[in-house]
Amino acid sequence: MASTSTASATAMAGAFAAAGVNKPRGSAACPRVPAGGRQRLSCVVRCDAGPGVPAQMAAMAASVAALEQFKISADRYMKEKSSIAVIGLSIHTAPVEMREKLAVAEELWPRAVAELTNLNHIEKAAVLSPCNRMEIYVVALSWNRGIREIVDWMSMKSGIPAVELREHLFMFRDSDATRHLFEVSSGLDSLVLGEGQILAQVKQVVRSGQNSGGLGKNIDRMFKDAITAGKRVRSETNISCGAVSVSSAAVELALMKLPKSECLSARMLLIGAGKMGRLVAKHLAAKGCKKVVIVNRSVERVDAIREEMQGIEIVYRSLTEMYEAAADADVVFTSTSSESPLFTKEHAEALPPVSGALGGVRLFVDISVPRNVSACVSDVGHARVYNVDDLKEVVEANKEDRLRKAMEAQTIISEELKRFEAWRDSMETVPTIKKLRSYADRVRASELDKCLQKIGEDALTKKMRRSIEQLSTGIVNRLLHGPLQHLRCDGTDNRTLDETLENMHALNRMFGLDTEKAVMEQKIKTKVEKQKTQN
């Protein structure tokens, strides 16, 4: 974490102007904003050899040129510290028509992470893409360039022009990005305040990232701390008590649209038996529904639901029987991962009308993203479609009490945020500590070797040699103890981060460690080698 520069506010304005996205909440400038306006520099080095130069000489020249390029790149990026950033959209900023084009299925998260980390200025990445949001968390080598690359990637993936996309994106950086994730994990940013399913989805990001290796230590730690924050908020504030979920809100909405006298007699069809579908069945049972027909690819998940819910009749239908089952249903819930609509206007027109006691209208309640039911189905006279964006009217009724609990939750989030920032700050000085110890150990080993040569190997017993080595190590450790104490940044003393960083820079100058440049050179070198391997 770098100290705030005088150019921070200007650089932040430049970053938003360049990326064309909304400013982070909270402050006009964030603490790690780099000075903008540097020339764009490609990390890919080309070195053309003349026709008479052997291939090995050309390769050697390319290698030397690449090393020089690393140094130039490192110099230019020195003031652009690696930043944690999140860029995305949610139900609060974008309609479902846009969110579904950007949605990334869970099994495709690793591929998306691989594509993102292949971008020139993205070091590590994570994707969180449940039904109500699509968020990309990254460690960016360059703030301005990295954000532009992500927006372009999102535009390419979705087919939405970048200009249109920017109108709906939000972006947070460093501590603002961390706070946002902690709020998401705690259910404070959900459509349904305090809902619990988002915490499971945050956990899945960690599991997916551990398998793909794309998270890196900063994002991995941030997500794990977000899980801790989410658990604490739910256990210490009871924000989830009485809270509805997306699935229960879908059931409530369907029952609101049915005549009260016919709610329990309406024929219910559920398409999809995943996590969301299972919760729909559970809430239907809790409302007194006696029978639910479930269409699913395999019978095993339906059997599991049947075993869990003994008080309701569960009938299984295969996917080939879906339209036949829909013809016999008054209310159709859809919750699948299908990339294309299951019901179009033509499908709805082919279905027979429902009972006049139910108003003659078949209800489609679609909680899938991408949507399983085309919006044009509502153009059919005897059909109405509701999607996740229509759940807001149900949610508002239960919101006031949980808003009070959300204020309590912010105290917990601030505590966890402080703990994470202290850890991240402590990581800032680790390279300097390592290089200083390595430098001191090289000096110790060199001087020890000179001493032993003067004494003569034959004049020393093993015990005497070991004692001399321990003496040299002890002297070095005692000498380093004071300086290293002044590099501690874990919140256990009264030293500010700026003071700690000043100490770090002083040690770098005094001992010629050049740590920051070496770290950046290594990052750029890793990027170039990765690109060469893929090409």
Swiss-Prot record:
It catalyses: (S)-4-amino-5-oxopentanoate + tRNA(Glu) + NADP(+) = L-glutamyl-tRNA(Glu) + NADPH + H(+). The record marks 180 as: Important for activity. Pathway: Porphyrin-containing compound metabolism; protoporphyrin-IX biosynthesis; 5-aminolevulinate from L-glutamyl-tRNA(Glu): step 1/2. The active site is at 131 (nucleophile). Keywords: Chlorophyll biosynthesis, Chloroplast, NADP, Oxidoreductase, Plastid, Porphyrin biosynthesis, Transit peptide. Primarily expressed in roots. One of its GO terms (cellular component) is chloroplast. NADP(+) binds at residues 272-277. GO terms for molecular function: glutamyl-tRNA reductase activity; NADP binding. Its EC number is 1.2.1.70. Pfam families: GlutR_dimer (PF00745), GlutR_N (PF05201), Shikimate_DH (PF01488). Substrate binds at residues 131-133, 190, 195-197, 201. It is found in: Plastid, Chloroplast. GO terms for biological process: chlorophyll biosynthetic process; protoporphyrinogen IX biosynthetic process. During catalysis, the active site Cys acts as a nucleophile attacking the alpha-carbonyl group of tRNA-bound glutamate with the formation of a thioester intermediate between enzyme and glutamate, and the concomitant release of tRNA(Glu). The thioester intermediate is finally reduced by direct hydride transfer from NADPH, to form the product GSA. Catalyzes the NADPH-dependent reduction of glutamyl-tRNA(Glu) to glutamate 1-semialdehyde (GSA). Belongs to the glutamyl-tRNA reductase family. PANTHER family: GLUTAMYL-TRNA REDUCTASE, GLUTAMYL-TRNA REDUCTASE 1, CHLOROPLASTIC. This is Glutamyl-tRNA reductase 3, chloroplastic. The lineage of its organism: Eukaryota, Viridiplantae, Streptophyta, Embryophyta, Tracheophyta. The gene is HEMA3.
